């Protein structure tokens, strides 16, 4: 059975934002603050390190009621028994991912505009990550910012919940939620925060109030 998931506050990891802090500690604090969906995004780790880190995170977040999805790497997700996989437009096709992971794991897909949101209709995915909403330096190949209006159009086209990503902060989170987003995907707003738990708690409150 596919796990229930709460996309209200979705942490996307970036060890480059941690200023030397331990990733598991930051993730644990963020989950304690209300991030109930976590994506492990590791572009530089070797496969063995990736699997070991993913396995440790599964053991950390699952007892706390959160879910872990793996960015891009279906093999890593299966090896560590993660809750799902998140893919981008240049990764494996969603139908192929679904065939590998089966019906009982989560599958997310990134979309960067209306055309991709429209093309995602009918795909076997559980949610879309839409953005960047605002200009971001976290992901160099993120594409042009779509703004609130672009987000609204992507949400209107979607058949599944849409999580907004791309320089979403406490200052603009309410507007993002008011646009109809199912949740906020955060990278630096939590990973780079001096107190990840407090940052997550503040963002969680804003997200829930913004619905």
Swiss-Prot record:
Q: Which residues bind Mg(2+)?
A: 72, 91
Q: Does the keyword Magnesium apply?
A: yes
Q: Which residues bind 4-amino-2-methyl-5-(diphosphooxymethyl)pyrimidine?
A: 39-43, 71, 110, 139
Q: Which cofactor does it need?
A: Mg(2+)
Entry superkingdom: Bacteria
A single GO CC term, please?
Answer: cytoplasm
* GO-annotated biological processes: thiamine biosynthetic process; thiamine diphosphate biosynthetic process
| Note accompanying the cofactor annotation | Binds 1 Mg(2+) ion per subunit.
E.C. number: 2.5.1.3
Q: Which molecular function GO terms apply here? A: magnesium ion binding; thiamine-phosphate diphosphorylase activity
* Function as written in the Swiss-Prot or TrEMBL entry: Condenses 4-methyl-5-(beta-hydroxyethyl)thiazole monophosphate (THZ-P) and 2-methyl-4-amino-5-hydroxymethyl pyrimidine pyrophosphate (HMP-PP) to form thiamine monophosphate (TMP).
The molecule here is called Thiamine-phosphate synthase
Q: Which gene encodes it?
A: thiE
